[in-house]
Structure formats: C-alpha cells, structure tokens
UniProtKB/Swiss-Prot annotation:
This is Large ribosomal subunit protein uL1. Signal peptide: none annotated. Binds directly to 23S rRNA. The L1 stalk is quite mobile in the ribosome, and is involved in E site tRNA release. Disulfide bonds: none annotated.
Amino acid sequence: MGKLTKNQKLAAGKIEAGKAYSLKEAASLVKEITFTKFDASLDIDVRLGVDPRKANQMVRGVVSLPHGTGKQVRVLVLCTPDAEAAAKEAGADYVGLDEYIEKIKGGWTDIDVIITMPSIMGKIGALGRVLGPRGLMPNPKSGTVTMDVAKAVREVKQGKIDFKVDKSGIVHTSIGKVSFTAEQIRDNAKEFISTLNKLKPTAAKGTYIKSIYLSSTMSAGIKIDPKSVEEI
C-alpha cells in the first residue's frame, strides 16, 4: 500500500476506529473528511438481514429524496407521438421512439433512466441484452413504465431513485453531494432508511438493518448506529 497523502492522514485521524457514529455526527463528519476538488457524491451502504436468493426476501423499491441527489439525471422517454410534448415540457433530455430504439441496438446508452409506456414495452423487450446489464430496463415497479410519462420524468428529475438489495445483502445508493448541508444529508439518509424499513420482508428473521455506512466518493466509510436514525 502506498503512503497516505496529507489529506488522507487528516481524514483517518478524524474517524475513531470501531466507533458507530450517530447519523447526525456522520452527516457532519463525512463533509470534514472529504478533500476532493470536485463535488463528490455521497453514498450509503446498508447491510440487511435478508437472503436475496429467496424470492420472498428480495428488497426492492423507490424513494423520493427530500433534497434530491444533486446529480444531473439524463432521461430518455420512449413514447407515442401524442405524449412527446408533455415529456419534453417535463424536462426529458431525449424523447422519441424508433430512432432511439435503433441507437440503443447500436450500443448507445448515454443516459441514466429510461421511461416508457406499457404499450411500448413490446418494442423494448428486444433491448434487454443492452439495457439489462446496465440497470436501464424500464420496470413498472420503479415507476418507469407508466401512462403518465411526464409525471415520471418530473419525479426522476426531482430526486426519485430506485434501488435493490445485491447478492450479498447490501443496498447501495447515492443520497446527495458533499456540498449538501449536514441537515440535507441527514434528511436524505433518514428518508432512505425509513423506506427500507417499510419494505422489510415478512420472511426476514432476526436483525433487519445490520449495518449502515456513509462515505463520499474518495473517503473512508463512516459506521452509523442504526438506532440513531430514529432519534433525529
């Protein structure tokens, strides 16, 4: 391992080994230990007491973060011509149908979210090999297959994100930027964890939220005491 930089040493000195911080403390601390020249993303990792291999213990959902994600989300709407104007007005970056389907078949995926209509899904099914591995396939459960594409665009632009537990039982997502205030970070984290609690599978036994870590793009993870989330 290479030598630590001056900033890395400063950051390491601020985190007490083995300590579980309150969410309030962690939201302030993550700003103190991030020294990037760019506006780093803030990530949260929550380990759940579930077995994702079992269908009745899969955790997947959507959450609208109170303060958004701070990211510019590029949205493609695949829709019928009568819905195009509303989608554009709502803020979609790309709107169309056949021309974008052909672009995607050719490997174009320079987007973050695809929103479409139920009547269009038949055409999109063939794109699964391109979109699936990148997590871009529209899904009714995440609200990206809908008759009201304009509403879906507004929600995504305002900070609605979808998430699911991975094979090792961890849910990972971004909840903002390091430029956010500590209060905004706390609000977003609390809303996300509250949503996870509501999605607890009835088949899950024992401790549900096993651990929570908050970090920025270039920082170490800060361990959070799950009990502290409800204290704010």
